[in-house]
Amino acid sequence: MLLDALSMTEKLRPRVCLVLTAGGDPSDYYAVSYEAFNAAGCDVTELKLFPQPSAGPEERLGSCDLVWVGGGSVANLLALWRLHGVDAAMRHAWESGVILAGVSAGSVCWYVGGTTDSFGPTLEPVTNGLGLLPYANGVHYDS
């Protein structure tokens, strides 16, 4: 999936912004992600909300070819993005042609909703996604 997202940019050296909000912006997750994207020939930056938000989310996201969003709690991700205006910045990036992709929470967030374990051990509906795609997304449907 990662290579498919990178190929959609049609760039030899895509500019990628990592957004790992759903997992709490863990430094080890960033390190592994930087390693993977650098190995794939990308220029990498990040947009963090912990412990302090990165400045200029709209400019940071808009200057990239691909935004890659990691997994974790989609409920926390959506709440924090809305609090910090990242939701609007993501929409603007998408409308400007930036490829938006990700895994788990980083996949559900683009849709109207889907299922999540963000509220407890069982899958529950999440219905307040960004709505960039007018569908539901069932990640982890087999787990």
Q: For each predicted feature, which ranges?
A:
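Flexible gly/pro-rich beta->alpha loop and the following alpha-helix that scaffold active-site loops
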Residues: 42-99
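Class I SAM-dependent methyltransferase SAM-binding "motif I" and its flanking Rossmann-like core
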Residues: 78-143
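Short beta-strand segments
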Residues: 19-20, 69-70, 138
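Short, glycine/serine-rich, charged loops/turns that create anion-binding
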Residues: 23, 73, 107
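N-terminal beta1-alpha1 cap of cysteine-dependent amidohydrolase-like domains
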Residues: 1-66
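Short, surface-exposed connector motifs at secondary-structure boundaries
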Residues: 12-17, 72-73, 133
